[in-house]
UniProtKB/Swiss-Prot annotation:
SUPFAM superfamilies linked: FMN-linked oxidoreductases (SSF51395)
Function: Catalyzes the conversion of dihydroorotate to orotate with quinone as electron acceptor.
Organism, scientific name: Paracidovorax citrulli (strain AAC00-1) (Acidovorax citrulli)
Residue positions binding FMN: 65-69, 89, 149, 182, 233, 261, 284, 313, 334-335
Pathway assignment: Pyrimidine metabolism; UMP biosynthesis via de novo pathway; orotate from (S)-dihydroorotate (quinone route): step 1/1
Gene that encodes the chain: pyrD
Any GO molecular function: dihydroorotate dehydrogenase (quinone) activity
Record-listed substrate binding positions: 69, 114-118, 182, 187, 262-263
Protein name: Dihydroorotate dehydrogenase (quinone)
Upper classification of the organism: Bacteria, Pseudomonadati, Pseudomonadota, Betaproteobacteria, Burkholderiales
């Protein structure tokens, strides 16, 4: 159980610049994890196992990518009670991202806008941090799953994007429980073009081929080959016809799941609010319905068995239940953690555990 109520720390953090508060929090988590200080934010480990994409998720609540871009805080996040933690997005080479300021709170809407731009320390540093974590062996706790989210460098031309994704896939493959291919951030120029028909077909074809090659190679740790599931993260700003084409392409190339959705470029729900006109991706409550719409469309297009991770606008247990009813199998949170604190994690996990399971 967390020793420090978030209601006491949130005013201090919200009094700071949004990115400065983020960096301070990540530094604190990185320094305190695997020490007695970790109890300050530890949460109840809710057991609600679900089988998905050949994996056993300890519960149905995950940490979305983007919070821990450099995989510095894997164990700290796991201690909050997440059943799975996704870190990244990582790119082959380190890059600074977009100029600051680039993260803005919209508290009236329980929302954030960011245009960070895949700022990260690069693949080598990312893998070093992953190897330092002990997420597979947390004493007295159920092992969480670890997702590693990959992208392309901003300076890589879009026609060469596949090269970056394959470099990252090869690097993260031995360390991931699953890999996420991020083609939907609005903050890397032209990245969302990879969601178009021909571009997506080419990218996923190359990824599928490389994955099959990697899956035949014995792993150093076990001496046995392992097929790592691959998820693809898509945007909320898609027409139903685009969602249907993406769904077909995912299935054709043997992808194991889809994450719906990333942030939105729409400002319809926040017009008139301070910072609403800042460029970047909008997350939090205003993206909830768009995310749910895409999830419903995906479930219709993909059938009942294809894994869907729902993310976008979860600030309460009720929001998470709504995601599952829309068609998601499990959920992820990010902005909700910032506005509600770590207590949200077990609250959501318990609410989802209480839902009737399909027959």
């Amino acid at each position: 159980m967390s020793l420090i109520p978030y209601a006491l720390t949130r005013p201090f953090l919200f009094g700071m610049d949004a990115e400065a508060a983020h960096e301070l929090t990540m530094d604190m988590l990185a320094r305190g994890q695997r020490t007695p200080l970790q109890w300050a934010w530890s949460g109840e480990q809710v057991s609600d196992p679900v089988q998905l994409a050949g994996l056993t998720f300890p519960n149905r609540v995950g940490m979305a990518a983007g919070l821990d871009k450099n995989a510095r805080c894997i164990d700290a996040l796991g201690a909050m009670g997440f059943g799975f933690v996704e870190v990244g997005t990582v790119t082959p080479r380190a890059q600074p991202g977009n100029p600051k300021p680039r993260m803005f709170r919209l508290p009236e809407a329980n929302a954030l806008i960011n245009r960070l731009g895949f700022n990260n320390e690069g693949l080598d540093a990312f893998l070093h941090n992953v190897r330092q974590s002990n997420h597979h062996a947390r004493p007295g706790m159920r092992p969480m799953l670890l997702g590693l989210n990959i992208g392309k460098n901003a300076t890589t031309p879009i026609e060469d994007a596949t090269r970056d994704y394959l470099l990252c896939l090869e690097g993260v493959y031995p360390h991931a429980d699953y890999v996420t291919v991020n083609i939907s951030s609005p903050n890397t120029q032209n990245l969302r073009a990879l969601q178009s028909d021909a571009a997506l077909d080419g990218l996923l074809g190359a990824i599928a081929e490389r994955r099959e090659s990697l899956a035949r190679q014995p792993e150093k740790a076990t001496g046995r080959p392992r097929r790592v599931p691959i998820f693809v993260k898509i945007a909320p700003d898609l027409a139903e016809e685009q969602v249907a084409v993406i769904a077909s392409t995912l299935q054709r190339h043997g992808m194991d799941g889809v994450i719906a959705t990333n942030t939105t470029i729409s400002r319809d729900a926040v017009q008139g609010l301070r910072h609403a006109e800042e460029t970047g991706g909008l997350s939090g409550a205003p993206v909830r319905e768009a995310s749910n719409r895409v999830i419903r469309q995906l479930r219709h297009a993909l059938g009942k068995d294809f894994p869907i991770i729902g993310v976008g606008g979860i600030l309460s247990a009720e929001d998470a239940v709504e995601k599952i009813r829309a068609g998601a199998d499990v959920v992820q949170i990010y902005t909700g953690l910032i506005y509600r604190g770590p207590a949200l994690v077990p609250q959501v996990a318990k609410a989802l555990r209480a839902m009737p399971r399909p027959a």
